[in-house]
């Protein structure tokens, strides 16, 4: 039926529009680091969310004393050669133990608890797509000032070729080799994502042209071929989107976690560009189903309405 074929072609055109929007925008994956940045700017940088507990200071590992202090006999009740790290000693107050006899005893300070190690790293609020990764507008005033001064670029292009990134010099050889292998794996996932979604758009566009010609010439076989092409394009789109999700999960679980993992305060998730791509996938599969169903319905109706020949008729 021409109505089903026309509806399938309209859905395929809408799917092409959604896929084009997804390809041309950068909101596939979004991160929001404002809550993490605000927490790290507070004094101490400690988390106060329910259910999170810091390790008490008395359970922290002990630090050995310098060799000069180990020669002296240990005090009573304290093992020789070890001492607790106190805030007074961190501030350089070394004369507490050699105070005069008549001096007033000072209260001992509590062991110093280090801040969150994630606060030593800078996390930005970003949006990323297939081609670019950009800083989100209005999420960080310091970054906005650097962008206005030209020190930091608003967007950086996503690389589809291998480049060795700079790594900390204190990493072991095995860790460095693992990071290099993970970079190759992430690069292959990005290439598969871009390649398969490009194939999907090309196949859907070609199928739409074949379907339009089939509707104009009332050729059922061309409409059937167009439906098969739509289903093939939807399959390529499924592979592309699944590979994109796998690539994002792989980036978040890379080793070592101290370099590639995100703190819990940073909210991250998929953006509206990803949902446009999934919507285009659904419309593509639906259009393929309608275009392959229309020729079979028209063939069955023509067989039912075919006039019966009388006996002796040629």
From Swiss-Prot:
UniProt KW keywords: Membrane, Signal, Transmembrane, Transmembrane helix
Residue segments, region Disordered: 32-83
Pfam families registered for this protein in UniProt: Claudin_2
Gene3D superfamilies: 1.20.140.150
Entries under InterPro entries matching the protein: PMP22/EMP/MP20/Claudin, T178A/B
This protein's record includes keyword Ribonucleoprotein: no
CC annotations in GO: membrane
Predominant subcellular localization, coarse grouping: membrane
Domain of life of the source: Eukaryota
Transmembrane segments: 194-214, 228-248, 274-294
Feature: compositional bias, Basic residues: 36-45
First and last residue of the signal peptide: 1-24
Cellular localisation: Membrane
Name listed for the protein in its UniProt record: Transmembrane protein 178B
Organism phylogeny: Eukaryota, Metazoa, Chordata, Craniata, Vertebrata
């Amino acid at each position: 039926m021409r109505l089903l074929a026309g509806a399938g072609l309209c859905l395929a055109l809408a799917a092409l529009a959604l896929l084009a929007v997804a390809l041309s925008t950068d909101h596939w994956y979004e991160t929001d680091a404002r809550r993490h940045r605000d927490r790290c700017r507070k004094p101490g940088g400690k988390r106060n969310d329910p259910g999170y507990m810091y390790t008490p200071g008395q359970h922290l590992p002990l630090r050995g004393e310098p060799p000069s202090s180990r020669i002296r006999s240990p005090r009573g009740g304290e093992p020789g050669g070890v001492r607790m790290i106190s805030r007074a000693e961190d501030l350089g107050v070394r004369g507490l133990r050699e105070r005069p006899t008549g001096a007033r005893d000072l209260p001992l300070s509590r062991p110093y608890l280090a801040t969150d190690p994630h606060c030593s790293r800078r996390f930005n609020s970003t949006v990323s797509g297939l081609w670019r990764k950009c800083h989100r507008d209005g999420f960080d005033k310091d970054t906005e000032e650097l962008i206005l001064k030209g020190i930091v670029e608003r967007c950086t292009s996503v690389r589809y070729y291998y480049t060795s990134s700079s790594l900390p010099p204190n990493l072991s050889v095995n860790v460095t080799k693992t990071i290099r292998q993970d970079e190759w794996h992430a690069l292959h996932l990005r290439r598969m994502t871009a390649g398969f979604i490009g194939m999907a758009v090309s196949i859907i566009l070609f199928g739409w042209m074949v379907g339009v010609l089939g509707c104009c010439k009332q050729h059922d076989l061309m409409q059937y071929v167009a439906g098969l092409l739509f289903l093939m394009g939807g399959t390529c789109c499924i592979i592309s989107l699944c590979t994109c999700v796998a690539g994002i999960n792989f980036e978040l679980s890379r080793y070592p976690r101290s370099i590639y993992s995100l703190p819990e305060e940073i909210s991250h998730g998929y953006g509206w560009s990803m949902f446009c791509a999934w919507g285009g996938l659904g419309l593509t599969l639906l259009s393929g189903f309608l275009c392959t169903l229309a020729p079979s319905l028209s063939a069955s109706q023509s067989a039912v309405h075919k006039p019966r020949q009388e006996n002796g008729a040629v």
